[in-house]
Amino acid sequence: MNEYQIRLVTGPAVEPVSLSEAKIDLRVDHDDDDTLIAALITAARMEAEGLARRSFVNQTLDLSLTNWPADGCIRLPLPPVASVTSITYYKEDNTSATMSSSDYITVTDVDPAVITLGLNKTWPSDALRPVAPIRVRYVAGYGATAASVPERYRALIRSLVLVRYESRDELTAPQERQLQNIRNALRMDYGW
């Protein structure tokens, strides 16, 4: 089995829901809670991405692998994938090399996106260092703007923000059920 780790390199430049949108939902017409609401938006986006196992607004990720895949396919978590920036590997002597993009094919119209070898190509045969020897850097997300995120996800994030804002002091039983329904809706998309 090929173990992997995912690391955020560059986070999204914007959130899927703006502060002004959230304030309208919350019926807040003052600026006193702006910092809190902005933090709730970020937390809601991160929770939603984790539950849906998707990236909403473009962000750069590093996928670290322990070895080359036996089946010839590298599956990229947290779709959708916009592009693969590079595949870098570290040899036994800790020097790095980058695969030529002509050696592999990135298939982004499937979930999860897949990297496969090009025709008559093979994974590098160099001996690899023992820890995190392979790094795939890629951009994942629906696009660079909040408008590119499907409305379904934006609505669920807005709902998370609303419940969290209203339950700052204490979470009631109806609010807990509402949170669970939102979480279940986000988990429904996870099918890969």
Put a short name on every predicted segment.
Residues 1-192:
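Divalent metal-cofactor coordination and adjacent catalytic microenvironments
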